[in-house]
Design a protein with these regions (language model features):
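Flexible, solvent-exposed coil segments and beta strand-coil junctions
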Residues: 20-27, 78-87, 146-155, 194-199
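Gram-negative (and chloroplast) outer-membrane scaffold detector with strong preference
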Residues: 48-146, 166, 178-181, 217, ...
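Predominantly the C-terminal beta-signal and adjacent terminal strand-loop region
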Residues: 68-69, 170, 175-225
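Bacterial N-terminal signal peptides that target proteins for export
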Residues: 1-7
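Sec/Tat signal peptide C-region and signal peptidase I cleavage site
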Residues: 13-19
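Transmembrane beta-strand segments that form the barrel wall of outer-membrane beta-barrel proteins
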Residues: 21-40, 56
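Extracellular loop and loop/strand-boundary signature of outer-membrane beta-barrel proteins
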Residues: 28-33, 87-93, 154-160, 200-208
Length: 225
């Protein structure tokens, strides 16, 4: 809801101060350096021309959750001291996703921003929000004991955690504008998180997070006048 409201507000402000603005939407995937998974998702954005060859842009991306390939193990403890066994080992899989907010400047080479074929590139910044969730198995590692309701995880074994990071990067792409219709585009971004923090041990212990990641996007842009 926050992201949707932010886009609507930004769109209205841009319309109020400039006669031309572009909206875009598409799909793509994100891949962390040395990460075992690719995250597929969707994106939407706005682009505001400063002149025929230079624009400012903003984009929101949602890259859907993936699970770790290997299970991890946590220790759960009985809520009643008389329960036997008093502690159990339980396997779990962690899932991980990305929500991204990015903005930056694009410089077009070849034809103009709103005509023909051209390349573009520039620098950007990005805020990334990750949610880490643990899916615990219903029984312990032996398969003999159901633990939910009688046992509890430790204080540092929360079922959900979050990571917030700030990244700087570069983007390059190609686009072709069909007169009177719109623009198709493809771009690649390389981002490096210069600052990031997890709110608990669940967030900090995932192996799907990488400070260096690449985003590949394809989509359609419509110019509004």
């Amino acid at each position: 809801y926050f992201v949707f409201s932010y886009i609507c507000f930004t769109f209205c402000m841009v319309q109020a101060i400039n006669a031309q603005v572009s909206i875009s939407a598409g799909t793509g995937f994100l891949r962390g350096f040395q990460s075992e998974k690719s995250f597929f998702g969707i994106h939407g954005g706005l682009e505001l021309p400063r002149n025929n060859d230079v624009t400012l842009y903003g984009r929101v991306g949602q890259y859907f959750a993936q699970n770790e390939d290997q299970a991890s193990t946590a220790l759960v403890t009985a809520q009643d001291f008389t329960t036997v066994p008093y502690q159990l080992q339980v396997n779990y899989f962690s899932s991980f996703n990305y929500t991204t907010l990015e903005g930056g400047t694009r410089y077009y080479i070849g034809n103009d921003y709103d005509s023909g074929f051209s390349g573009y590139g520039g620098s950007n910044f990005m805020l990334a929000f990750n949610t880490v969730k643990r899916d615990y198995e219903k029984t312990d590692i032996t398969g003999m004991y159901e633990w939910e309701g009688q046992y509890q995880t430790g204080g540092n074994e929360e079922t959900e955690g979050r990571i917030i990071s700030f990244a700087l990067g570069l983007q390059g792409g190609l686009k072709y504008t069909f007169p009177g219709t719109g623009t198709v585009y493809f771009d690649i971004s390389a981002q490096y998180a210069i600052a990031g923090v997890g709110n608990n041990e669940t967030a900090n212990n995932t192996n799907l997070y990488s400070p260096l990641y690449f985003i590949f996007n394809v989509g359609f842009r419509k110019d509004l006048y």
